[in-house]
Amino acid sequence: MADEAPARSGFRGGFGSRGGRGGRGRGRGRWARGRGKEDSKEWVPVTKLGRLVREGKIKSLEEIYLYSLPIKEFEIIDFFLGSSLKDEVLKIMPVQKQTRAGQRTRFKAFVAIGDNNGHIGLGVKCSKEVATAIRGAIILAKLSVVPVRRGYWGNKIGKPHTVPCKVTGKCGSVSVRLIPAPRGTGIVSAPVPKKLLTMAGIEDCYTSARGSTGTLGNFAKATYAAIAKTYAYLTPDLWKEMPLGSTPYQAYSDFLSKPTPRLHADA
């Protein structure tokens, strides 16, 4: 009995020593089969923005961000950044809720996604199964993809390599401050912000963190909030007024007014 205690205490091996390899294998197989069906399924947009993207009316993500159009379908991100997107699971942690029948355990997944070239997203999902939590977190991360503004530390020579100014993000007690750094410095930070900054395409940056940085979820969310603020500051080079044209919804109103063909489920 003493030898079996460690196997029963872990949550990754199923219930008891019998559910170790078999339970995980079945779960992984179901997830793999499900992903294959989703990948082979053709995308049928359900929003106006999705229809415009599918028909090629909108050429890039920046055009969507320019008019602050909300993205409700993760396939839009796949359409523009599918081949360059990389996702990484930051952490999977068990969370419990006390019920009448006892404790209900679920798994919480933190996933970061980016293309190493100016786009970053962060997703958090809780589910009964690890595979379902990761899959849901990836979808939420794609829906939360934001543009990253990069700048220079000194002279504007070469490509932008660091954050344009000092920015701060906060979540819970954790506060993260990003500071521009000279070219060649690298990313001076803890492992969690370093992953997010690298996936965002920032090459050089100093960081300063305060609070309970051991709480990985809040640490990642604070870093994501700081990166997202790079486009929130109105620097002098953005003072010039740029007249905006009509939104894509207005420009292609005739196309959007046409009825969409409905799908009929096969009997």
UniProtKB/Swiss-Prot annotation:
Gly residues compositional bias, start-end: 11-20
Basic residues compositional bias, start-end: 21-34
PROSITE patterns: RIBOSOMAL_S5, S5_DSRBD
GO cellular component: a single term: cytoplasm
Record Pfam families: Ribosomal_S5 (PF00333), Ribosomal_S5_C (PF03719)
Disordered: annotated span: 1-37
Entry superkingdom: Eukaryota
One Gene Ontology MF term: RNA binding
Swiss-Prot/TrEMBL GO biological process terms: cytoplasmic translation; oogenesis; translation
Keywords, sorted A to Z: Developmental protein, Differentiation, Oogenesis, Phosphoprotein, Ribonucleoprotein, Ribosomal protein
Domain S5 DRBM: 85-148
Modified residues (Phosphoserine): 60
InterPro entries from the UniProt entry: Ribosomal_Su5_D2-typ_SF, Ribosomal_uS5, Ribosomal_uS5_C, Ribosomal_uS5_euk/arc, Ribosomal_uS5_N, Ribosomal_uS5_N_CS, Ribsml_uS5_D2-typ_fold_subgr
Family: Belongs to the universal ribosomal protein uS5 family.
Role played: Component of the ribosome, a large ribonucleoprotein complex responsible for the synthesis of proteins in the cell. The small ribosomal subunit (SSU) binds messenger RNAs (mRNAs) and translates the encoded message by selecting cognate aminoacyl-transfer RNA (tRNA) molecules. The large subunit (LSU) contains the ribosomal catalytic site termed the peptidyl transferase center (PTC), which catalyzes the formation of peptide bonds, thereby polymerizing the amino acids delivered by tRNAs into a polypeptide chain.
Protein name listed in UniProt: Small ribosomal subunit protein uS5
Species this chain originates from: Drosophila melanogaster (Fruit fly)
